[in-house]
């Protein structure tokens, strides 16, 4: 029994010496005593290859490469102890979830924290850390007693409570495992106990290579190996000079020196002979003087400089993508020009979550075979999502999001139906569910679902059409596809008495969906497309899910569990599932994390993402215990994993290892921006390397080849996939700026694409963007007639839409596009309710021959309640009756109608104008409809402007009959003559023209009528500010002012007084007008003369004619208006269709000048030739 150390700096040949000794021993005595070669888990594959890579050693039974966990398996299989069921990380998280749920009421700190994402991962890591450091539940309990007895501050009490919670959960966890299960850490503890009984290990020659430190648990294994084995050889990365000096925590080899001393202490305790240490002083790894210099002088202060040509390269990249592309280009150059193999190259990084997806895509495009050494979660695989969302459907009462997350896994689709067909149908089905607000009991009810196209309050009694019936049948068929398997599982879960039966329900759910066959089809499809990584994913995920169900049953099978807890525990287990890494092929670039990698035989290393806060790492206080709390526990005698401060001290050693892996070339790079364009800073580590190699030039990597010389651009010609974008850059620059000279070799590259059979079609689609102009071509006469017909019938809103943006009009009325219908109460729905409610009250008053002035306050309240109750079941598929929230909203809407009724009552008392009709149709056909506004366009097309007028009021005096238009609005609005001029506000003047033009046929007494004005009535329930001692009358007066109607009224004092008979002088509380003492109008009055009203009406006709002409002649310009802070695009539903982009040459707003009303009126006169 002896111990031997082999020490030396990085690259000194420690592993080579050990492997050579083993190989020589195998050549001399192939059947001798066991040789154990222990390495970290991530080194086992490459070490096994190196061991049998010698020509003289093609295989061996005597020598085996192990990690600690693999050695545990080997020993336990030999001496017993492996009969207990192994639970993996997912099983641990599930068990912890169950323990926490059952203990929740007794927890102090973790009761709420348990609901946070990642809690069980942190808790599992904490318990694993306890085990690795030989901390038992009783140790934690004793620590809690000590802390509880001496805690006075809030921080101390928090730590005491946290330790108490940890002790409870750790103890429950250990009790659940006793005699039944083993987790990963338990194997190492069992290994310590069983090693003395192992004949396989007894007398073995043991090599321990590649470790820098050992946990207390691992140190105990080393102790037993020294006791049981013949000799233990341990390699450590230490400079021999360090051992002759006092240990300093700032020393580069501080961690490995401590490990050296700990192992020697163990050997002394066990009276193990300590052989003479073998120090290795040479640097056989490095074939480059520069890399040898970097290793030898890495920690020197001040930095030792290396002059001359160096094999160290520093790059700064414009962004992360440019950085990765630069790496890819250099890898291809090394392989093509310097005879490198891909396996000779490694890429090291730390923030893999930012890089892996980009690297996977770009390395594939550059045809670089690669292996990413990462653990990928299974949480996004369709199978995992299907199980999780199906359980959420059941436990969450069939919420929309859970249902369609399950649908979109496509595992609910019947096996014999084309996926493409099902996707289209399910999209339609989802639209239906969104429009009808389907959730909850509607999914489980046997009542068939109905489909009707109507949404209007006036269109509720239509007969079902054939197309509606066909759609209804499809919807019910798709409903059964979705709900049937889930309902079957739901029933089984409710009947289940134990966890075993609940797991069986999940298994049967998957089997009845033919999931294994569907996954096999996905695997075959992935293989056919050459994506072998994802092909194996589909195999792995089924095996892992089945293993998870088995583990669940083994651990908790006979227990009873609520459905919600079962869902939570299952979800916790599913979140922990990870894809196993498939060993790399013989010739791939290895992409690995700096902290986990243990590289060997690498000629070139690319260290990427060397940004501040990443390399070296910024301090991060994460996990269950903070650094301060760990320090408290450490002071009390509980040793745990290093604190953030200790980890930061070890960063220098990590970076030293990072830059000493390669034998020939080292590349260091950093991006200046991330994928979102946020600025990143270069690491101070790059400055250190620059000081060591002052002759090395920091080169800049860009995505834009136009920034490079022609000689530099040639390196950007790589594979057809990636080069196409650079050809585009060159051609765009040439086209836009017409630079002097020619495109040199880029024309040759261009010719390759346009002549290649494989790339001709692909490249033409991309290259066509060179000539892309986001312009909508004018429709031909034939197309225009097909879309709009020979007779156009449109509302005023449609005409206004055309003037806002011709393309938006084309999208809505030509292509008939519309937004997805969502089951929610929008502004148009509320507006429709307000109109309907006020019309019903007014109709009732007309039938009773009463006016608004006749109503009492109580009647206003009663009528508002009655009409809202009548309308609620008719509005938007009964949305106001669908939930408590909407019921509350219904009450608020009733209050608004009540308040509006009171105001209309006050207006009626103060006005000579009375409503003569509401919701007056024109051009709609049928009894009571006024004629449309008709136009014969120059191209022969007939156009009718139609609509419905909210309210028409009439007043009479000795001067004749006057008519005014009242338009109800759910937001404040005024008539802007500038908008009238630009054709953006034509509605009110159109309505006024229709009623006055048709007065002789419309009014019961016949005759003519003059325009009195157009006014907007804002329906709302305002809040007013008043003094604390204000009376109720004063408050009501202030509220009345908030309802002042804005618009444009006839500039006739008598007519204005008809509108407000309380007005003598001053401003009216009812309309936007006021009178001075001399009888003239105040400056702020919104008035127009009768002649001006006539001019405005002529202008409306003129504008409609122009609009009609443009529509029928196919004008669909993408030319939205912009006026001040208003723009057509702000609330447009078609932005994703037109792709309007101000950065494009052809896409600019039509900027409309804001004008005073007088200026706008003058321009209107000019247009129509008015006086």
From Swiss-Prot:
One of its GO terms (biological process) is double-strand break repair via homologous recombination. Its cofactor is Mg(2+); [4Fe-4S] cluster. Pfam families: ADDB_N, PDDEXK_1, UvrD_C. The keyword Nuclease applies. It comes from the Bacteria. It comes from Bacillus cereus (strain AH820). Belongs to the helicase family. AddB/RexB type 1 subfamily. This is ATP-dependent helicase/deoxyribonuclease subunit B. Its EC number is 3.1.-.-. The heterodimer acts as both an ATP-dependent DNA helicase and an ATP-dependent, dual-direction single-stranded exonuclease. Recognizes the chi site generating a DNA molecule suitable for the initiation of homologous recombination. The AddB subunit has 5' -> 3' nuclease activity but not helicase activity. Residues 1-343 form the UvrD-like helicase ATP-binding domain. PANTHER family: RECBCD ENZYME SUBUNIT RECC.
